[in-house]
Structures are given as C-alpha cells and as structure tokens.
Amino acid sequence: MITGVFSMRLWTPVGVLTSLAYCLHQRRVALAELQEADGRRPVDRSLLKSKMVQVVFRHGARSPRKPLPLEEQVEWNPQLLEVPPQTQFDYTVTNLAGGPKPYSPYDAQYCETTLKGGMFAGQLTKVGMQQMFALGERLRKNYVEDIPFLSPTFSPQEVFIRSTNIFRNLESTRCLLAGLFQCQKEGPIIIHTDEADSEVLYPNYQSCWSLRQRTRGRRQTASLQPGISEDLKKVKDRMGIDSSDKVDFFILLDNMAAEQAHNLPSCPMLKRFAQMIEQRAVDTSLYILPKEDRESLQMAVGPLLHILESNLLKAMDSATAPDKIRKLYLYAAHDVTLIPLLMTLGIFDHKWPPFAVDLTMELYQHLESKEWFVQLYYHGKEQVPRGCPDGLCPLDMFLNAMSVYTLSPEKYHALCSQTQVMEVGNGE
C-alpha cells in the first residue's frame, strides 16, 4: 500500500475519443437492428480475433512497510532478497518522455525503516519475485502458447510497460517479463514511470488537493466507526499493543499478509484474527473511499481509466499509425489502485487484492460483423463488468459504463484543483 507531469502526447485528445465512441455506438445500433430481425444469437467466439491485452497488476510479496510495536519482532533476513536466476532480465527505467528516471521519495522513505534482521521496509522478496514470474508464465500460456497472439520473444513494438516509480514495482515488472518471455528479447526493455507528484497509477492524495480534502475527515475517523472501533480495540488488546499506538487495520493487514506470504512465525493473535483483520481493512478502505462518492473515485482512478480507454479506442481506429499501438500494455500498480478500479468496474469482491494479482482486459473484434468486444479477468477469473450483459461485453456498452468515472487529464486537473470542496460522509 502507499498513501505525469502528464505528457499530453501520450493521451488521446478528448474530441477524438468522443467521435470514435459515437461512431462505435452507431455501428453497434445498426448491427443490433440486424440481430433483432432474426433474433439475437450468442457470439461465435471462434470468430473473435484478439486485438489487444491490457494488464493492471499488483507487485509481488514484500517486507512490511511499518513493523508492529511488539516486543517480539519478526525477523526479516536479507537472504529473503536473493534473486532467482530465472527472473534475471535487464531493463531501463525512464520518465514518460523517455528521459532519466525520476527521483523516488517513497523508496527513500522505505530506506529509513530497517526491520529486525536487516531488511528495509517495503522490499520485494524472493517469494514476490517468484510470484511475479509465475504470473508472467500464466500470461505466456494464455497469449503465446494457447493463442499465438504475442511473439515468444519480447519486442518493444508489441509491448508497452508502465510502472509506478517504486523499486518493488519495477522489479516485479522485471520478473513478470522474465516469465512471460523466458528472458528472451529483441530490443531494449523500457519501463516508463512518472514523478510522484503527478503519478496516476495510484490515488494521488498528495498532489490531488480535492481528493485529499474530500477524504481527510474520513481517513481521520475511520478507526472510530462502530464495529471497526470495537474490533480494532479487541485485536490490539489481545496482541498487547497500547491503545495510544497508531496501529490501524491497514498496518495489521500489511504485516499479517507479509508474514503469511513468507511463512514467518508471527503473533498468534494476528493469525487468530486474520479474517477479521482483512475484512475490517476492506471496510475501512470503503469508508474512506465509498462507492457513493463518485467524484472521489473519479479522482482516485479516473485518469487510469482514461488511459485504458484511450488504448482501446486507438486499437479500433483504423487511422491509428501502427507504431502508436501495442498488442500488450502492462501497468504495475498497487492494492490501493485495484480496490477503487474494481469498484468503478463493478467487480470488487470485497477481498483485499493479494500480492501479484492481475486485472486483465482483452479486446476482440468479430471477423464477420466487425463488432468489438471486451473481456475482463480478475485473478484469472472471468468477470461481468457493470453495465454489461455477460462476460463478453460489447465495447460501446463497456465504454459507456466506464465513462461514469473516466477523467481526461484536463478534467482531472480541474477537479483536483477545486478550491471549495464539500466532504462526503465525514463521520456519518
């Protein structure tokens, strides 16, 4: 968990997107009239051609971001940082414009916390690297072996990679690519990232003033809410954590998940209350960023939705130059990205996103009707997005559902800079 300069050339102009969406809608209306005449038939999937895959994923297992204030501390041995040989894959990190890698304030912050045993906080471990390699192998099976969509060797003409500028995410991406392409490449691997103050691959409470203001009260009072407050007191009392210590369900879950992933001995009470801790962490997150607060959700993930939407529309536009589109788009994000993203798509399962989880968006075109479809998978399981009749969703219906939360860079900056903001649900 974590609490571009927008390169305008990387964003499709709003007017173009609107025109493309309108044309797509008109084409679907005409097709619907034909289908209505003879009765709508199920889509023949054998006539669907893969056009694009977009994957938003969480990094692999890591050390906790902040240790619990317990007398007996879990030991985080630096041997856990050993790099599995099969995950070795050279890469370069640039900013969005192709310039030098930006400074990472988060990594600097993590290096200020040394855990018992010698590891720094928030570091990707060997376990996490193996998880990401396994995710890459699953993607290889899906898009190289089962369906020959991607080349078996990495090619920068086929793959675009974007990550937050945090080392565990960059390294997770390396391991995923190693699994996906078995360490074979034709051309350099470039991972694009952004400055922390303009990053949109997580809800940016630091730079989006309105988002920070709208949620500030809820963040301060979340642990005081009925049910959450009583359960937090119970867990802290049983674990011997003083009531004055600033430990919430996020910190408890963070340590619990990290210890479980590495099979490390932990406080028995942490194991006993594992289910409650996860559920209350989810409840806390939904209190801070509720589904009823549309504008906050827009500011949290609206720009990322816009990026995903832009890629879809560029792919179906015959006027798009071949060098402006990729077959695969990879986005290395975080749990705090995935929760609101899944909420906006109507597929959040009220479970905390685990390490190395992925949200995969596939784009298809029907070979005969030329109609476009989107298919979503979360954690490898087919999903039915909000506003869609089933898993295989007509693209215009999917875009219409996304439009409720999608924000162009201009609208994002306008919303974030609002000077008067009314907090929603503060303490209620």
Swiss-Prot record:
It is found in: Mitochondrion. It catalyses: a phosphate monoester + H2O = an alcohol + phosphate; 1-(9Z-octadecenoyl)-sn-glycero-3-phosphate + H2O = 1-(9Z-octadecenoyl)-sn-glycerol + phosphate. Its main location: mitochondrion. GO terms for cellular component: mitochondrion. Gene3D superfamilies: Phosphoglycerate mutase-like (3.40.50.1240). CDD domains: HP_HAP_like. It comes from the Eukaryota. Keywords: Hydrolase, Lipid metabolism, Mitochondrion, Phospholipid metabolism, Transit peptide. One of its GO terms (molecular function) is acid phosphatase activity. One of its GO terms (biological process) is lysobisphosphatidic acid metabolic process. It is an enzyme of class 3 (hydrolase). The active site is at 59 (nucleophile), 335 (proton donor). Residues 58-168 are annotated as: Substrate binding. The keyword rRNA-binding does not apply. Its EC number is 3.1.3.2. The keyword Iron does not apply. Residues 1-32 form a transit peptide. Hydrolyzes lysophosphatidic acid (LPA) containing a medium length fatty acid chain to the corresponding monoacylglycerol. Has highest activity with lysophosphatidic acid containing myristate (C14:0), monounsaturated oleate (C18:1) or palmitate (C16:0), and lower activity with C18:0 and C6:0 lysophosphatidic acid. Belongs to the histidine acid phosphatase family. Monomer. This is Lysophosphatidic acid phosphatase type 6. It comes from Pongo abelii (Sumatran orangutan). The gene is ACP6.
